[in-house]
Amino acid sequence: MEAGSRVIMQVLLLALVVQVTLSQHWSYGWLPGGKRSVGELEATIRMMGTGGVVSLPDEANAQIQERLRPYNIINDDSSHFDRKKRFPNN
């Protein structure tokens, strides 16, 4: 039985190695050999030429500030919380 399981493991390992060596990885926008197409490279360069600055509309900025406001109130007025003493006074 031990020899049978050993043969099965060797066949599985061989199948895995063959599958990995024969498979070709194709990523979106890449050609075989890891080369990019020229058209996609030009589009990427043009996109980077804009500076990459994205401004949020005023409405979105107001919504973000509204969501963060309760946290600012808690942080500013935290003096009413008493710290618990870890060790009693003797």
UniProtKB/Swiss-Prot annotation:
Any Pfam family: GnRH
Which PROSITE patterns has this protein been placed in?
GNRH
Keywords carried by this UniProt record = Amidation, Cleavage on pair of basic residues, Hormone, Pyrrolidone carboxylic acid, Secreted, Signal
Enumerate the InterPro entries for this protein. GnRH (IPR002012), Gonadoliberin (IPR019792)
Please give the tissue specificity annotation from the record for this chain.
Answer: Expressed only in the terminal nerve nucleus of the telencephalon.
Residues modified as Glycine amide are 33
Signal peptide residues are 1-23
One GO CC term of this entry?
Answer: extracellular space
Location in or out of the cell: Secreted
Name the Gene Ontology molecular function terms of this record.
Answer: gonadotropin hormone-releasing hormone activity; gonadotropin-releasing hormone receptor binding
On this chain, the residues bearing Pyrrolidone carboxylic acid are 24
Which cysteines link up through disulfide bonds? none
Functional note: Stimulates the secretion of gonadotropins.
What family does the entry list?
A: Belongs to the GnRH family.
- What protein is this chain from? Progonadoliberin-3
Origin organism is: Haplochromis burtoni (Burton's mouthbrooder)
